[in-house]
Amino acid sequence: MNHHEVHAVSAFAMSGFEQSLVFAIDGGGDFLSGLMAVGSGTVIAQLVSFPEHNSLGLFYLETIRYLGCGMFDEYKVMGLAPYGDPDRYRELFAQFYELLDSGGYRVHLDRIGPALLRNIQVRRKGMPFTQQHRDVSASLQEALERIVFHTLRHHRKATGMTRLCLAGGVAHNCTLNGKLLYSGLFDDIFVQPAAHDAGCALGAALMVSSELGRPAPRERLPDVYWGPDLGNEQATELELNAWSGHLDIQRSDDIASSAADWMANGAVIGWVQGRSEFGPRALGNRSILADPRPAENKDRINAVVKKRESYRPFAPSALEEDASEFFELPDGTRQLPFMNFVVRVREAKGNVLGAITHVDGTARLQTVSRKTNPAYWDVINAFKKRTSLPILLNTSFNNNAEPIVQSVSDAITTFLTTDLDGLVVGPFLVRKRPASLQDWSALAASLPPYASLHRVRSHIAPDRQETVCEIRMGHSAHSSMRISPELFEILMRIEGEASLGSLFDTALLDQAKREDLVKELRLVWELRGVRLHPLHAACRHDNVQSGT
């Protein structure tokens, strides 16, 4: 099996189609950058493959390097593109690719850098985006769409296939997918929810299963809630109670109504239920949720929770049965459960949905079915009863330093290190409480597996060096954070598991210094340079016995 073949299987075998065109397209793998095939029954017959030097993924990546972005930042530029005008650099981008006969194309990756260096002010990471950068983003997105449409039109006509499956990293370009949806080129489109390389594992497993005589049922994939389960209620409550100095915890007999009350009154909350999602999207089990109406909710979540660029859009989750009232869905389209398509917000509703309507009047919609996720459907429906709006703002439950939360522990950590107003875990409503120095001192500190302590000589001026202390994240000195010598010494004392209080006692620190170190630790914890967590029960008992 090869890279793009398993991409193709991951989409076609989950689509529910008996026959379809299958387009797998990404940055590269096994010296190719994609393939076009026809799926029929349990067989996928390749029509054409695309060499790595014609990679559309690399075409996108090579361009965004000059916008201060790197690998895996493609989605940021996709979100920036609607702020730009593609006319400005259309002729420039026309030099970077050719549309060939029979649906072929040629990409000139070597022309991109020199041309952009001559024509734009290159952006460094962290600098503001200018209108020039927005226009480059728009031209890039338009060029990608032109190439993909050119290829698909040819193969649609040549094969007569009326359905399409998409996989590969480029298939996560939701703007492109939305254009395909509205084009009418295909009667139905299925995009593998884990279109990136994680989906290759699924495709490989499906291929082997089919070869062993156990092909996947020809059914449409209903959901991807395949990750770790939250656990039983008793275990969840025990874990929450271990943070009792930091959290107020209340069990609700109607968690959907309680959460909806919070959001209807302006709260931005973490929502954690059941099994986590497979793939890159939070689809209602590991989500940050909020009222989709106030535009300031978008600004607030970007600034104080996600701590990311202010232009970045948020997605709506809408009840499946009500979605068409608020969004322009093509005829026959009712279910969009995986946030794979950007769709138009109805003009009359755009002003109402200020937090989820992008600058071009679109949104990356998730429709929610009562059958596939009853808990999430219930909370949206409860919000509808209070506001007449069957929609919530939904974004992944994480900060800018970590992936999406999985466990109760992850959820608590992210809740305590962001400005979320509340947390819902299973049937429990959780709020923050002001923690005392004693509460913080009762926690244990440890270094994550990817972090290490270093004391190094560093230039603080061209002619002056001094010794500095830092935590390195991974193996690169470029991914490091400076810490005080006092915190360095405390972290160096960690052996096994001990409370911060006992470490402070060993270092003979006064109260003022302890307060300073707790404040610094909380900042480092927010960036995941250290872990703070309750002591295990046995260790808590030992510390009580020793008087700490």
Swiss-Prot record:
EC numbers for this chain: 2.1.3.-
Molecular function as annotated in GO: transferase activity
Pfam families membership: Carbam_trans_C, Carbam_trans_N
Keywords of this entry: Nodulation, Transferase
GO BP terms, alphabetized: biosynthetic process
SUPFAM superfamilies, per database record: Actin-like ATPase domain (SSF53067)
PANTHER family recorded: NODULATION PROTEIN U
Stated role: Involved in 6-O-carbamoylation of Nod-factors.
UniProt similarity note: Belongs to the NodU/CmcH family.
The protein, known as: Nodulation protein NolO
Organism: Bradyrhizobium diazoefficiens (strain JCM 10833 / BCRC 13528 / IAM 13628 / NBRC 14792 / USDA 110)
